[in-house]
A protein has these predicted regions:
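Catalytic cores of eukaryotic secretory-pathway lumenal/extracellular enzymes that build
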Residues: 1-202
C-alpha cells in the first residue's frame, strides 16, 4: 500500500472546469506530492480549454484521452480510470467541476480515520456538494459552507429514484450515516476500487 497517497479519479466530458478543478485541487492540498490523478478526458479536437498537455510529464498524472464522439458514458470512463489505480491508500472520485478548501486532503483523511476509530470498518464519505460560481464570486457565499445530505425526492416515471440534496441546518462536526452515495464525491479506502468496481456497461 502506498501510505497517505490519494488516487483522484476524474471523468471529464468537454468540461471547461477540468483545468481549474485540477489547479484548485493541487493549490489547496497541504501535501500535493501525495496526490495521484487518474483522468479520463473526453474531448473535441477544437477545444483548448481542457488541454492536459502541461500535466503529461508530471508523474502524478495518469491520463486517458478519447474523442467526444467515442464516449460510452461516465460509468465506462470511471471503469477505465479504476484500471489506473496502483495501491494508493485512498480513492477519491470527483466530477470535473469542483473547488476545494485549504488543506482539504489532510482534513478529509483525518475525518476518514476518525470514523475507523469509531468502529466503522470501511467508511465512505460521500455527499452532494454546494454549487459554486466558476469565477469564484458566489451569489450566496453562505451556501459554500453548507453541509448537505442526500434524500429521495421521488420515483421518476421511467423507474429510477430521483435523488436530491438538502442543507443540514445543524452543521455538526461529524459525518452522519446515509443511505445513498453521490458519484460526484466519493472518498474511501483504496480497496474500494477492487471491492466495488464500476460496471462499464451502466
Amino acid at each position: 500500500m502506498k501510505k497517505n497517497k490519494i488516487f483522484i479519479s476524474i471523468a471529464s466530458y468537454r468540461d471547461s472546469e477540468l483545468i481549474p478543478t485540477i489547479e484548485n485541487c493541487i493549490k489547496n492540498a497541504k501535501l500535493p506530492h501525495n496526490l495521484v490523478f487518474g483522468i479520463s478526458r473526453q474531448y473535441h479536437p477544437d477545444d483548448k480549454f481542457d488541454d492536459l498537455s502541461k500535466y503529461k510529464k508530471d508523474k502524478r498524472f495518469k491520463i486517458i484521452e478519447s474523442l467526444w464522439n467515442k464516449s460510452i458514458g461516465v460509468c465506462h470512463a470511471r471503469h477505465e480510470i479504476q484500471k489506473l489505480y496502483n495501491d494508493e491508500e485512498f480513492y477519491f472520485q470527483l466530477d470535473s467541476h469542483h473547488r476545494f478548501i485549504k488543506d482539504w486532503d489532510t482534513k478529509i483523511k483525518k475525518t476518514f480515520r476518525s470514523l475507523i476509530k469509531k468502529n466503522h470498518k470501511k467508511p465512505i464519505i460521500s455527499s452532494y456538494l454546494p454549487s459554486y460560481d466558476p469565477d469564484t464570486k458566489s451569489k450566496d457565499e453562505d451556501k459554500l459552507n453548507d453541509v448537505w445530505r442526500t434524500y429521495i425526492d421521488r420515483f421518476m416515471p421511467e423507474g429510477p429514484i430521483f435523488i436530491f440534496p438538502e442543507s443540514i441546518e445543524d452543521k455538526q462536526a461529524e459525518p452522519e450515516p446515509a443511505r445513498f452515495l453521490s458519484g460526484h464525491f466519493i472518498f474511501a479506502n483504496g480497496s474500494f476500487v477492487n471491492e466495488v468496481p464500476y460496471d462499464p456497461k451502466l
